[in-house]
């Protein structure tokens, strides 16, 4: 398996001949330093493997965790055996080596198992299953799991949004196709409602729109201010729970300022204002909700209605408006 092959490189990345030649010129201190580095690399590898194993479903995570434990156990054993042999070549002896008397030098150096533990500092999990993981190991494992869980949630949310968007678009297409209509995409920059209306006005005039999206914002805000008594009840119902930020009139004025001077997303309040400003019938198609019509009193027989589409699941950030045009008359 690929991970095993990569992990075994921690144990030895040299050929036997190269390792033998290097060890002939290696001091005990250098060897011990190398051993510590090898153990540290194995610990890091264990953390990486556990992080990778924390992804996927619970069943997949359980299977991966068991595989990681087996792999780390094998690598730990292999690394320990290698280091024991190298220690023995430097005069160290095991405490269980057939009761052979230890010479003075060996007595001072201590038995191999003790030295290996001293070199390791903090052993990898497979080597000390009987002892509790250190706080740093627990923190690393916790961070790895939290990051993996976060990535999994993001994937699930993106998948959910994508699925909802596909369903919504399919329903909208089914509604528009028999009418010979289709959606003309509008930039999702916060001005989408006003840009969609601008696009419709341009299509109806056969040239440029008489109003830019910014003009339309200012017109909507001005009309709402002039007809405050008509819009205030709807505004309050939409902003219920914001009473701590000032009086109703103050909050309504702040809302109007945002409409005319920021990229705040538009809603039915602004559409209602625009239908009167422009004296146009506006119809909003949707794949998620019933179609909405505003300004029916302005509807005429010359097919001058403005047509938009409302998308609840277009983007992860929220709602969006597009322009609806004849199939053979798509414009930017």
Curated annotation (Swiss-Prot):
Q: Does the keyword Transcription apply?
A: no
Q: Which CDD domains does the protein's record reference? A: OTU_plant_OTU5-like (cd22797)
Following inactivation of the gene, the phenotype reported is: Altered DNA methylation of root hair-related genes and altered phosphate (Pi)-responsive root traits. Abnormal responses upon Pi starvation leading to the formation of very short root hairs instead of increased lateral root formation and increased root hair length. On low-Pi media, altered H3K4 and H3K27 trimethylation levels at the transcriptional start site of a subset of genes encoding key players in Pi homeostasis thus leading to a reduced transcription of these genes.
Q: Which reaction does it catalyse?
A: Thiol-dependent hydrolysis of ester, thioester, amide, peptide and isopeptide bonds formed by the C-terminal Gly of ubiquitin (a 76-residue protein attached to proteins as an intracellular targeting signal)
Q: Which InterPro entries match?
A: OTU_dom, Papain-like_cys_pep_sf, Peptidase_C85-like
Task: Extract the Pfam families matched here.
Answer: OTU
User: What's a single GO MF annotation on this record?
Assistant: cysteine-type deubiquitinase activity
* Transmembrane domains' residue ranges: none
* One GO CC term, this protein: cytosol
Report the protein name in the record. Answer: OVARIAN TUMOR DOMAIN-containing deubiquitinating enzyme 5
Organism this protein belongs to:
Arabidopsis thaliana (Mouse-ear cress)
What is the gene name?
OTU5
């Amino acid at each position: 398996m690929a991970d095993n092959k990569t992990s075994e490189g921690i144990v030895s990345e040299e050929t036997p001949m190269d390792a033998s030649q290097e060890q002939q010129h290696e001091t005990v201190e250098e060897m011990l330093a190398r051993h510590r580095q090898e153990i540290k690399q194995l610990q890091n590898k264990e953390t990486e493997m556990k992080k990778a194993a924390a992804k996927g479903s619970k069943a997949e995570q359980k299977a991966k965790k068991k595989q990681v434990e087996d792999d780390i156990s094998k690598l730990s054993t292999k690394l320990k055996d290698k280091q024991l042999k190298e220690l023995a070549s430097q005069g160290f002896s095991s405490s269980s080596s057939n009761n052979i008397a230890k010479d003075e030098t060996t007595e001072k150096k201590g038995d191999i198992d003790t030295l290996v533990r001293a070199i390791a500092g903090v052993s990898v999990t497979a080597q000390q299953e009987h002892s509790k993981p250190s706080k740093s190991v627990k923190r690393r494992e916790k961070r790895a799991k939290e990051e993996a869980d976060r990535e999994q949630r993001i994937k699930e949310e993106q998948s959910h949004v994508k699925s909802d968007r596909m369903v919504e678009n399919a329903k909208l297409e089914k509604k528009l196709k028999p009418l010979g209509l289709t959606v003309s995409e509008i930039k999702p920059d916060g001005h989408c409602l006003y840009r969609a209306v601008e696009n419709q006005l341009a299509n109806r005039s056969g040239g440029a729109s008489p109003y830019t999206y910014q003009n339309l914002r200012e017109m909507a805000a001005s009309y709402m201010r002039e007809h405050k008594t008509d819009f205030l009840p709807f505004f309050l119902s939409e902003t219920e729970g914001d009473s701590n930020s000032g009086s109703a009139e103050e909050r309504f004025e702040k809302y109007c300022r945002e409409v005319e001077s920021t990229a705040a997303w538009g809603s039915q309040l602004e559409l209602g204002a625009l239908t009167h400003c422009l004296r146009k019938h506006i119809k909003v198609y949707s794949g998620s909700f019933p179609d909405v019509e505003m300004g029916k009193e302005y509807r005429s027989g010359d097919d001058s209605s403005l047509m938009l589409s409302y998308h609840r699941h277009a983007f992860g950030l929220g709602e969006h408006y597009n322009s609806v045009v004849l199939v053979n008359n798509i414009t930017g």
